[in-house]
Regions:
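Short, conserved active-site loop motifs that form the nucleotide-linked donor/cofactor pocket
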Residues: 122-124, 220, 285
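Active-site substrate-recognition segment that forms the wall
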Residues: 1, 87, 131-136, 140-144, ...
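Short beta-strand to alpha-helix junction loop
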Residues: 9-22, 47-55, 96-116, 234-242
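Surface-exposed helix-capping loop/turn segments at secondary-structure junctions
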Residues: 27-38, 68, 121-124, 176, ...
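General small-molecule cofactor/ligand-binding pocket signal
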Residues: 72-74, 124-126, 260
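Dinucleotide-binding Rossmann-like beta1-alpha1 core, especially the glycine-rich loop
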Residues: 1-76
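A conserved FAD-binding loop/helix module that cradles the flavin
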Residues: 231-237, 286-302
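Helical element adjacent to the flavin cofactor pocket in flavoenzyme catalytic cores
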Residues: 54-66, 86-158
């Protein structure tokens, strides 16, 4: 998964999936007409050294040949012109990659409003129910006939397993190996409604701090870190303090951090970074998992 040839294949696949996902997301927006703090203000990836900028330029050349969205290298001064909230941080980075087409939205609101719309179309959602196992008929490749749940069996013609890292445990008793591992990450959400030009409107990735900042309406979402800790979802205080410190360093004065909404999640990662969207063993069982940190980016392309 890590050699140059395999990496190029994975990059091409991810770029194609991302483009397809964007198309389907835009089509969904036209149909659902929701309000989920959607914005298309672009993204800047900051690099602390000129060597980092040069390496990014090489990667852009590779991605361009594979069909990526338009991107360009900008100087630190040009980055500040695009996002004035970076002015105080300008001495800390040498340049950046600018992707004008990048968008942001509140994934939770998207999910809520898409669910409401689907209910109107006649889709049934079963909430508050624990999925226990998949019941099949015949041998190892036998068809799945039901999902066994805490509320009884649910039968269907086809079954899609889209449980993130929990897809592994559900499929294991059926002899299906799902190569997904949880990579733990943290985020916090801040109210920046009174921040003025101290808070960014452009999405920012600071490659030196390994932290991303996304403006979602009047809030700023700050996320980062990768930990290999199994399925632990605890939120140690020092992790959130670290994200707060990074926020104050990059965007001083954008928040008083009086109300911080912390969160921890498990990114379902595959060895190649490419999600798994395919049949799994039985003719009527499908997998849709392994999106890693690109869940929103790829979701509509793998649905």
């Amino acid at each position: 998964a890590c050699n140059a040839e395999r990496s190029a294949i994975s990059t091409r696949t991810l770029l194609q999936l991302a483009a397809l996902s964007r198309q389907h997301f835009e089509a969904m927006q036209e149909r659902v007409q929701g309000d989920w703090d959607f914005s298309t203000t672009g993204k800047l990836v900051l690099y602390p050294t000129q060597a980092g900028v040069d390496a990014a330029r090489h990667q852009l050349d590779v991605q361009s040949k594979l069909g990526s969205a338009p991107q360009r290298i900008v100087t630190a001064a040009e980055a500040v012109a695009l996002e004035p909230a970076l002015a105080a941080y300008q001495p800390q980075f040498a340049g950046a990659v600018h992707t004008p087409s990048e968008c942001a939205a509140d994934c939770y609101k998207v999910s809520q409003q898409l669910e409401a719309w689907l209910r109107q179309q006649g889709v049934k959602f079963v909430m508050g129910t624990k999925v226990q196992s998949l019941r099949r008929e015949g041998g190892s490749n036998g068809k799945i006939v039901a999902v066994q749940t805490s509320q009884g069996d649910i039968t269907a013609d086809h079954f899609m397993v889209a449980l993130g890292v929990d897809s592994v445990a559900l499929c294991k008793p059926l002899g299906v190996n799902v190569p997904v591992y949880p990579l733990k990450g943290y985020s916090l959400t801040l109210d920046v409604s009174q921040a003025g030009n101290k808070a960014p409107s452009v999405s920012i990735t600071d490659s030196s701090r390994k932290v991303v900042f996304a403006r979602i309406g009047e809030r700023l979402r700050v996320a980062g870190m990768v930990e290999l800790v199994g399925h632990d979802l605890s939120i140690p205080k020092d992790k959130i303090q670290s994200l707060c410190a990074s926020t104050e360093a990059v965007f001083p004065g954008c928040s008083d951090f009086a109300e911080v909404q912390p969160w921890a999640g498990l990114r379902p990662a595959t060895p190649t970074a490419v999600p798994i969207a395919e049949k799994a063993g039985a003719s009527n069982r499908w997998l849709n998992t392994g999106h890693g940190a690109l869940g929103f980016t790829l979701a509509f392309g793998t649905a």
